[in-house]
Amino acid sequence: MNIEVEMKVLDERMADFIPAYATEGSAGLDLRACLDEEVVLQPGETFLVPTGLAIYLANPAYTAVLLPRSGLGHKHGIVLGNLVGLIDSDYQGELKVSLWNRGSEPFTVKPFERIAQMVIVPVVQAGFKRVEEFVGSSRGEGGFGSTGSH
C-alpha cells in the first residue's frame, strides 16, 4: 500500500536528505539531524533535534511513528527521549526528535547524521461503549506475568 504524504523542506540544507526507503523491503525512513554544528550529549542528557522537515498526513487513517535507529541504541545507548514519537495526521509543524543518551559515554550528534526512523502506519479510531461487566475470557483480569514464564 502506498500513500502520498505532503512534505515541506523548512531548511534548504535538508533538500539533499529527503527521507527515502533504503530497500524495497524497508519499513522505516531515516530522519537526519538538521544542525549547524555538532552537539555532545552527555550520559543521561536529552536534546531535541530539529530535522528541517515537516509532513502533513492529512488522512486520520494514518499516523507517523518515530523510532530509534537500532545501531544507535545498541552501540551507543542513544534512544528517543519519549521512547516512541507519534505524529498525528493533522500535525503540520517541524518533525523533531528527542534523543536521550542512556549510555555511559558522551555521544556526538553530527549535522545531517541519521538519528531516527519514521514509519507510516494505519490507525483505527475506536469508539467506546460503556458496560457494567465484560463477557468472560480465558484470561480475565490476569495482568503482568499472568500468562506464564519465558
UniProtKB/Swiss-Prot annotation:
Its EC number is 3.6.1.23. It catalyses: dUTP + H2O = dUMP + diphosphate + H(+). GO terms for molecular function: dUTP diphosphatase activity; magnesium ion binding. Its cofactor is Mg(2+). Substrate binds at R69, S70, G71, N82, L86, I87, D88, K96. It comes from the Bacteria. One of its GO terms (biological process) is dUTP catabolic process. SUPFAM superfamilies: dUTPase-like. Keywords: Hydrolase, Magnesium, Metal-binding, Nucleotide metabolism. Belongs to the dUTPase family. This enzyme is involved in nucleotide metabolism: it produces dUMP, the immediate precursor of thymidine nucleotides and it decreases the intracellular concentration of dUTP so that uracil cannot be incorporated into DNA. This is Deoxyuridine 5'-triphosphate nucleotidohydrolase. The gene is dut.
